[in-house]
Each structure stands twice: as structure tokens, then as C-alpha cells.
């Protein structure tokens, strides 16, 4: 705790953003980080708490409080304040494989658990994490450091999202020879094609992948294991296989008119947009156009918000976002005390842009689609909506959804994007390896373990725990790497 009075002297700062009017004209990142001087002041606000909940990653009230990676937040905040950026970088890299990703896309569980929340605003931990990792790149700390000794063991990682990359990075550091198989044309999985460029610039991903390649990790793209590439080949040629394919099976909505043209899953919409942007800056036309259209986004989560922001940048005439649940309160309820994750209403970047552009919040709460209406060409032209109410079931005690009679409304719609979550991984992958899955189609393991029902096969990330955050995927990848290392070598020295 370099400055005991820091939290009293300095206010929370979170950097700036490019104006709404300017940023919606392109797909560039729009967050402007704090200066190093401002980051040092944020480091001074850290109180080096006796119990630092920011790094705890513990379950409270059924949700995680603090960083799942157990990042050493008080340590590197103090190091930043004292100007020791290199040591701060070393302490950050000890626990987090990819701070350049989490400092851009993580919802900052650490900040929600910060003790400063009790009497004010939290330390800007996410800003400081971003500052540390970018310092590492700017000052030559982030460079290839291949292992000096190889173990002779070969490991295949199926999937190059955050969990697969984290597992590959750790196992390569241990000296194993790692090959990562990716079904798409670019490495990165969810990071590359599931998150829009304005949230995570793809050059940031490629910058890190290039270092991993220099360190000896092999990447094979266009390899769809279980489809155009046999699982049996991997089991024969590698000592261990880690499945890290994500939860890529989107949840559909089965209502009348679903077969109409112009209705897409959000993941397809976002992927096509990013691919066309990277391939040709949209010159190839291989994306789903929203220009001049009334867009309906079904789903109120992060993916739904990304669809709102992407639709705006593609020239949508209007955007409506449906949320089945009631609007969350603006402040914590008494039943949701600190350090629990705050269950409050958040207006994200896409919604902010819609409010500024269209003059209204795009979100409509407690509402769902009853049916879609198509024109004579089979194209969606309208959607029938219905209001919902939530009532507690007297027998189960659970909240049950009911449609409100007479609340039906028809709105014009030209493009529908379904962002209703995911149901697990693609079954052809699990079938190809013969691994057991649970009732939610996640790959089954013993609690707290990563070894599947097949001897050589392990699992990590959303494919293991279900749809979750990038920070959780990184943790899963690191933990799975330890499991593999122990089984191959008899022990592990991985963090």
C-alpha cells in the first residue's frame, strides 16, 4: 500500500471513449485508455485490504465474486503506483495468460468486489491491467521465449478460443510440443469471430498469436475435427488431446414463421461481419446487411448488445432488443449486498449508441416473440410480440413465465438476430472422440477435474462448464494444462 490516503485523495477514473457520432462510423476500438500517470493514481487508490476480495474468485450468493484467475491485483496496483511497471507486468503474467484480451472484454469481476465500493467507487483495475500489458509490448517484455528443453510429449488442442490458447501456452512453456487445430480460417475462436472488432481489435489477437508461433506452437486452420479431420488420427499421433471447442451450438426459438428468410443466429451475423471486415473491408459483400432495415435482436445479454452495436455500424434504420426478464434495479437490492456481483441494470455501448441515434432505449423488457410474419417472397416483414409476467410457482417456489392476455403487438421487422444463448458444443465433436456429455451437453468430468471418460482426452472452457466469460475460459485452459502435465510427467510446475 504505497499511499495510505490514496483512496481519499483520488477519484475513480475510467478513461475516455470516442464520441458516439464518430465511433459508429467504423469498427475500430473506441476506448481511450488512461495515461500512465492516471493509472498510477488508480494504483494509489488500492487499499491493500486484509481480505482482498478483488482477487478471490469465490462463490458468494451463487455467483463469483472477484477474479477467477486470482490475479494479484493489490500487488501490481502498488507496483504501478511506485513506477515499477516491469515487475507489475511479471506479477500480472504469473496468473493471466492473456491480459490483452481480458483488459478489453472482461466485465471486471475484480472491480465489483473492490472494497472501495463500500463507500465510493472501485479502483479502475481493468484500466491498470490494460496499461501493464501494453507497457509490456511497448518495452519489449512481450516477446517470444521458447522453452529451452522439450519433453518429447505431443499434445493436440482442438479449438483456438481463449481456453484452447491458454492451455496451449501453458503446455508449451512446460516443454511439450503443442499443435492447435482450428476449424475456421483464422486462429482465435470466440475472440476472433464472436466478439466484434470495436471491442477487441483482431490485430491484438494476431499480435499474440505471432508470439506463440515463434515460441514453437503450431496452428492448423481449416481443421474441423470430427468432420474433415478424423479424431482417430489425433488419438494415434498425440499423447493427449484437449477439447476446447466452446459452447457454439446456439439456442433457437421455435415459433410460427421461424423459417422465413432474414432470420439469423447472432453468432453467424457477427462472424460474417468480422470476416468480411478483415477480408476486404466489406468490399466482398459477404456479410448480412442491416442497411436501412428494422432490426430485431432477441436476447438481452452481451451478444445481443454486440448485435445492436454491429447493426448500427452497418446502417440499420432502427433496432429493437427484446429481453424476457424484468428490468434489473438501478441500485443494489438489500438482498444483493457487496461483495456479491451487483445485479443491477447496465446500459452497454450498443444500447448507448442506439439511444443517441434513435432517441430511445432499444430494450423492451418482459417481452418475447409470439410469431414471425413473412411477405410473398418468404422474407420476414413483421414480428408479433407478447408481454410476459413472472409469478412464483407455489409448489416449486420458482418464478414461472406467463403471457399476458391481450398484450400482443405487431412491429415491422426486416432482419431478426437470435441471441438467446448457447446449448453446448457441437455433438459431432464429442461423438467423434466418444466422450460422455451431461444433460446440458457439456463434456462430463469428475467435479473439479478436466479428464473426460476417454483416457487421452481432456476438456476445458465453455465446452466443459457451459457458456461463460473469457476470464473463466482462460482459467479452465490453465487448469486443464496442469491436469495433462501431471498425467504425462507425474508432477507439474505450472502456475
Question: Can you say where each PLM-predicted feature lies in the sequence?
Answer:
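FAD-site-proximal beta/loop scaffold in flavoenzymes
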Residues: 259-292, 392-467
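Conserved hydrophobic helix-helix packing surfaces used for dimerization/oligomerization
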Residues: 155-157, 178, 295, 457
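Feature captures the FAD/FMN-dependent oxidoreductase FAD-binding
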Residues: 87, 149, 154-158, 206-255, ...
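Glycine-rich Rossmann-fold phosphate-binding loop(s) that bind the pyrophosphate
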Residues: 159-162, 299-301, 462
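C-terminal catalytic lobe of FAD-dependent flavoproteins
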Residues: 12-34, 42-45, 365, 373, ...
